[in-house]
Amino acid sequence: LTHFHADHVGSLPVLIMGMWLEKRTSPLVIHGLKVTLEKAVQLLDLFGWKDWPNMFPVRFNMVDDNGAVNFITDGGMRISALPVLHLVPTIGLRVESDEGRVIAYSCDTEPCPNVIRLADGADVLLQESAGLAKGHTSPEQAGELAAAAGVRKLILVHYDNRVAESELLGAAREKFSGEVLLAKDLLVV
């Protein structure tokens, strides 16, 4: 979990209940900052999840507030996290495969050096581009971050869908010469 805002954790109880209804038995590990995990547990507790019959094990792994290198190493991938600048404590992520492919996810953030560190040389940067409000990044700033990090492809996520697609893409392309896409349901990269 990158941070505790409703649009990022609000469906967690539904997700866990769905797994339980499907009779999951294998343990689930949820990673995040201490403050995020504490609030996530409070959210889950509203639904009495620990008392559901035959509930599968859930473990919470706290990511250090300063970030963590390779805090997940499983299934041919390594995941690292760094703090980014949002309205609440938030982490961005870097996923590296054993084959050398790299995807970075900024999460909700203002432009900051840690986004560039996470995305350094990445194949893909998933960069939020909600606009210039505090704690967020504009499409133009997303292009600047992608260029500074030397990524191959920029995918704008968490963007304002009231703004024309051509305007969003055009703003990012002013600053980044690589491929720029808008994230959409069922997008294959």
Where are these regions (language model features)?
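Cap/insert and terminal regions of metallo-dependent hydrolase folds
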Residues: 110-189
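Binuclear metal-dependent hydrolase catalytic cores
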Residues: 1-105, 169-189
